[in-house]
Regions:
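A helix-centric hydrophobic-segment signal that preferentially recognizes long
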Residues: 1-157
């Protein structure tokens, strides 16, 4: 047997091992990236559901003739601001996340003020549609928490 075949065989084997290892790392990175994108999509879906419910809730509350217009306006403006902020999970920066979180916090705080001021309107509290929307909103807040937790867990992998 020729002596030069052994070193060539070893080199070819090492190249093959490195190639397979590189492909494995690339595939794992792609799977991780896709999982992060999927979880971010779930977060956005939960926030979109909340925004849709807020629109329905505001329309129901508008039916109360003497309801505080400033509270409704604050909710509508916060919702508009939150829906204008979008993030691409593959190119996310800490500044974008901070802006997104600030917009969502604005929605949460104005929505909390709305729900507190509703306590002063017994007819509105007795409105079946309003109560249903309030329950759905609470459920959606739980979905948001779950989606954000799963996203954070996936990013840490």
């Amino acid at each position: 047997m020729k002596k030069w075949l052994i070193p060539v065989g070893i080199i070819v084997a090492l190249i093959a091992i490195i190639a397979f290892w590189s492909i494995g790392i690339k595939n794992t990175a792609l799977q991780h990236s896709q999982a992060v994108n999927k979880e971010w999509g779930n977060v956005n879906t939960a926030y979109q559901r909340r925004n849709d419910l807020i629109g329905n809730l505001v329309n129901t509350v508008k039916g109360a003739a003497d309801f505080e217009k400033s509270t409704l306006t604050a909710v509508i403006e916060a919702r508009a601001k939150a829906t204008s902020v979008t993030i691409d999970p593959s190119n996310v920066t800490p500044e974008q996340l901070a802006q997104f979180n600030q917009a969502q916090s604005g929605v949460s705080s104005s929505l909390s003020r709305l729900l507190v001021s509703v306590e002063q309107y017994p007819t509105l509290k007795a409105n079946e549609n309003f109560l249903k929307l309030q329950d759905e909103l609470a459920s959606t807040e739980n979905q948001i928490l779950t989606a954000r937790t799963r996203f954070n867990e996936q990013v840490q992998v």
